[in-house]
């Protein structure tokens, strides 16, 4: 189930994004990027509709994923 990111308290949203970024450990190429920059990038992807917040009833967790991969 998609959770509208706009419905979350801004601090809660930031915490979810930060947790996601730290968990993913994505390689950003030749230059390391700050946590704040990574969080800002994910937030922009949510705002543009490229990524979605997804609640998993099975695992009782929230995840962030590309909208194109969500098939719920």
UniProtKB/Swiss-Prot annotation:
It comes from the Bacteria. Pfam families: UPF0270 (PF06794). InterPro entries: UPF0270, YehU-like_sf. Belongs to the UPF0270 family. This is UPF0270 protein KPN78578_37030. It comes from Klebsiella pneumoniae subsp. pneumoniae (strain ATCC 700721 / MGH 78578).
């Amino acid at each position: 189930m998609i959770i509208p990111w706009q419905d979350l308290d801004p601090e809660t949203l930031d915490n979810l994004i930060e947790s996601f970024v730290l968990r993913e450990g994505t390689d950003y190429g030749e230059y390391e990027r700050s946590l704040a920059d990574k969080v800002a990038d994910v937030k922009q992807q949510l705002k543009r509709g490229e990524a979605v917040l997804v609640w998993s009833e099975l695992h009782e967790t929230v995840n962030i994923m590309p909208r194109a991969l969500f098939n719920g």
